[in-house]
Amino acid sequence: MFYKIKNIYFKIIIFLIFVFKLTFSSSYAKDNSLLLMITEKTCLICMVWEKQIGEIYPKTEIANKFPLSRIEMKDFVNYSKHELKKTNVTPTFIFIRNNNEQGRIEGYTSPEMFWWQVDEI
């Protein structure tokens, strides 16, 4: 009987380690990857993107790899988390992984074009 109790505790510990590792791994990936959207409150194209893509983006597979983070253009000028080249276009989407720019999309024309550009990155 003591052996069975010991075996159950062992299985529970292994299970908890597995769950912890799985949780830690996925949050680690999210912390090191993001999609930075540079926007402005008065940007009409940004508003169109929000309506057409912004509402569904969090539900997509790419959002698991690159969670969306928005920043105003005026704040991007002083943004120093990552060394990124400047932009004068809103919206601009910068894909960042491990503090390095993986790709960027400047502007927005349509959902089809946006997803095509995302696939290219």
Give the positions of each predicted feature.
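Short active-site neighborhood of thiol/selenol oxidoreductases, capturing the structured segment around
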Residues: 31-41
